[in-house]
Amino acid sequence: MNVNNVEMVMSAVSAAQYPTDGKPEIALVGRSNVGKSSLTNTLIQRKNFARTSSQPGKTQTLNFYDVENQLYFVDVPGYGYAKVSKKQREAFGNMIEEYITSRKQLRGVISLVDARHDPSEDDVAMYEWLHYYNIPILVVATKSDKISKSKFNKYENNIKKQLGFDSSASDFLFFSSETKYGRDSVWEWITAHM
């Protein structure tokens, strides 16, 4: 998709604050600093539209980005960041659960994992949870520029095995915000789920 118009419409912490215009939504989930904002910036072809940070845990609300007045990207707070209080983690969990389990406009979830590492327990739990709710999932292995393409199959097989990947209900792609590898394939998945 050629993106010319993007607007950060709102940040929300509850259903009462979600957009009401009925556009389809694609949520981006993953642990802190896995690259959700970088993926967003690459997809919309902007360098710093979605704020990236070297400090994990910066996103603390559901951030709705209107893309071409056709759909929303919903940037979800990262999980697994140890310096966030237990109370705050619970609040994030409740906010994410409310959104994902009740939002009719949600067409799919892009679940980001770091291509270089085994999925965390939180990554596995999120994948299982999304799968349980029959939500279309695209697993995106970020930072793929850090591994050799000749090893993609090895890393993909490992990630899928760790997640308990179900190829009948999920898709998998490698992605790099540095090289833009996988950008078009992610857009194809998004378009197919609008």
From Swiss-Prot:
GO biological process per UniProt: division septum assembly
Binding, GTP? 30-37, 57-61, 75-78, 142-145, 175-177
The prosthetic group or cofactor this protein requires is: Mg(2+)
Cite a single Pfam family from the UniProt record.
MMR_HSR1
SUPFAM superfamilies assigned? P-loop containing nucleoside triphosphate hydrolases (SSF52540)
Q: Would you tell me the Gene Ontology cellular component terms?
A: cytosol
Annotated disulfide bonds: none
Q: Which family does it belong to?
A: Belongs to the TRAFAC class TrmE-Era-EngA-EngB-Septin-like GTPase superfamily. EngB GTPase family.
**Free-text function comment from the UniProt entry:** Necessary for normal cell division and for the maintenance of normal septation.
* Protein name per UniProt: Probable GTP-binding protein EngB
**What organism does the record attribute this protein to?**
Leuconostoc citreum (strain KM20)
Gene responsible for this protein: engB
